[in-house]
C-alpha cells in the first residue's frame, strides 16, 4: 500500500467544517492507503491571528514532517491550503521540507471560496501564491466554479465536492415557518451578529431562533449574549442529535461573509431542511441557479427581505423545495460519488 502523510486539523480536538471534511477524507483514504497523521491544532481564540504559539506549532510540525519523510517512503503529502500571508508562508514551509526529503507528490486542499480574491489582493500575495503553485503537484478545489480563471485547464488543478458522513435520508417534515436554526461557530465573519440584529426586528408569528456554536473571544460573546431573549436562544456547541435538530428545524440560516462549500448546507440538504444563506463561495451552485432564499452577504436589509419572502411562501411550495434539496444532495454530493473522485485524485484505480 502507498503512504499518505496528512497534516491538518481533525476532530474531536478541532470542530469546524474543514476538520470534519478532513476526517471524512482520511476515513476513506485509510481503506486504501497507509495514513500517517501530523495533527495541527489552532484554538478558536487564535482565529485570524498570528501568534508565537502558532509559529512554535509550525516548527514542531516541520520537525515531525522531516522525521516521517526520512523514515518512511511517503507517496503523497496531503494538507489544507491556508489563505493569509502567514498561512501561505506555512504552506510554503511544509511544501519545501516535504520536497526536500521526499520524491512524493504534494496535494493541497483549498476549502475556501476566496482564493482568487486573495491572489489579487496585493503584489505580495501574488508572488507567494505563484511560487507555491510552481512547486505544488496538485490543488483540490471544492467545485469547478471556485477554480480561479488563471488556473483553469492546468493539470495541477482538480475539484472534490464535499459529502456528509454518516449519510442518511431523513423524513421530510411539515414546514411550520417557526423554527430557525443557526449552527456554526460564533465568529463575526460567519454573520452571527447580522442574523441576531435582523431577527430581533422581525415581527411575525411565534418565531424562535436557536443558535449553536463555540465562542471565539469574550468581547464577541458579550455582544452575542446581548441579543438573548424569549425568541433568541444562544447555546453551546451542538454535539449530540445534530441531524435530528437540523431535520426538525423549519429553516437553517447561514449568513456567512465568506465560505467555500459549507458542510452545514449539505447537512441541511440531506435532511430536507430549507436554507437561507448568503450568496458567497459555492453556495449558489450548491443550492441551484434558481434557488429563492439567497441574499447578499453583510446586507442586513437583503437578509430581512429574504426571511420575509420565506415566511410568505406557500407551505406546499416549501415542501416541494425540501424534496428538491434532498434529491439534489443525493444526486450530486453522495458518499459514493465523493469516494470515487477522492480515490481518483490520489491515483487509486479499483
Segments from the language model and where they lie:
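Glycosyltransferase donor-sugar binding loop
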Residues: 39-43, 183, 208-221
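Short hydrophobic beta-strand element within catalytic cores of glycosyltransferases
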Residues: 274-277
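A charged, aromatic-enriched C-terminal amphipathic alpha-helix characteristic of glycosyltransferases
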Residues: 315-347
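Aromatic "clamp/platform" in nucleotide-sugar-dependent glycosyltransferases that forms part
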Residues: 257
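Conserved donor-binding/catalytic core segment of Leloir-type glycosyltransferases
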Residues: 5-7, 171-190, 195-201, 209-212
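Nucleotide-activated donor-binding/catalytic signature segment of Leloir-type glycosyltransferases, i.e.
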Residues: 221-238
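Donor nucleotide-sugar binding/catalytic pocket of nucleotide-sugar-dependent glycosyltransferases
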Residues: 128-169
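Conserved acidic donor-binding segment of nucleotide-sugar-dependent glycosyltransferases
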Residues: 289, 293-300, 309-315
Amino acid at each position: 500500500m502507498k503512504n499518505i502523510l496528512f497534516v491538518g486539523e481533525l476532530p474531536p480536538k478541532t470542530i469546524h467544517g474543514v476538520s470534519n471534511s478532513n476526517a471524512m477524507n482520511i476515513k476513506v483514504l485509510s481503506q486504501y492507503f497507509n495514513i500517517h497523521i501530523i495533527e495541527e491544532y489552532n484554538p478558536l481564540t487564535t482565529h485570524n491571528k498570528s501568534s508565537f504559539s502558532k509559529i512554535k506549532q509550525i516548527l514542531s510540525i516541520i520537525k515531525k514532517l522531516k522525521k516521517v519523510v526520512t523514515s518512511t517512503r511517503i507517496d503523497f503529502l496531503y494538507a489544507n491550503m491556508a489563505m493569509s500571508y502567514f498561512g501561505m508562508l506555512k504552506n510554503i514551509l511544509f511544501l519545501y521540507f516535504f520536497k526536500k526529503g521526499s520524491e512524493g507528490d504534494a496535494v493541497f486542499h483549498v476549502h475556501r471560496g476566496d482564493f482568487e480574491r486573495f491572489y489579487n489582493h496585493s503584489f505580495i500575495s501574488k508572488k507567494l501564491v505563484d511560487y507555491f503553485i510552481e512547486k505544488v503537484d496538485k490543488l483540490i478545489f471544492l467545485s469547478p466554479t471556485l477554480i480561479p480563471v488563471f488556473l483553469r485547464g492546468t493539470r495541477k488543478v482538480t475539484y472534490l465536492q464535499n459529502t456528509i458522513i454518516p449519510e442518511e435520508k431523513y423524513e421530510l417534515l411539515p414546514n411550520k415557518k417557526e423554527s430557525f436554526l443557526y449552527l456554526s461557530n460564533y465568529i463575526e465573519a460567519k454573520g452571527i451578529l447580522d442574523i441576531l440584529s435582523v431577527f430581533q426586528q422581525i415581527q411575525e408569528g411565534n418565531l424562535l431562533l436557536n443558535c449553536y456554536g463555540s465562542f471565539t473571544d469574550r468581547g464577541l460573546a458579550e455582544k452575542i449574549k446581548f441579543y438573548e431573549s424569549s425568541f433568541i436562544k444562544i447555546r453551546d456547541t451542538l454535539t449530540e442529535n445534530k441531524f435530528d435538530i437540523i431535520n426538525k428545524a423549519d429553516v437553517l440560516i447561514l449568513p456567512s461573509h465568506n465560505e467555500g462549500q459549507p458542510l452545514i448546507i449539505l447537512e441541511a440538504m440531506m435532511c430536507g431542511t430549507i436554507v437561507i444563506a448568503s450568496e458567497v463561495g459555492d453556495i449558489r451552485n450548491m443550492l441551484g441557479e434558481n434557488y429563492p432564499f439567497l441574499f447578499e452577504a453583510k446586507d442586513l436589509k437583503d437578509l430581512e427581505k429574504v426571511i420575509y419572502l420565506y415566511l410568505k411562501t406557500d407551505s406546499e411550495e416549501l415542501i416541494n423545495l425540501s424534496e428538491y434539496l434532498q434529491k439534489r444532495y443525493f444526486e450530486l454530493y453522495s458518499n459514493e460519488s465523493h469516494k470515487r473522485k477522492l480515490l481518483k485524485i490520489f491515483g487509486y484505480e479499483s
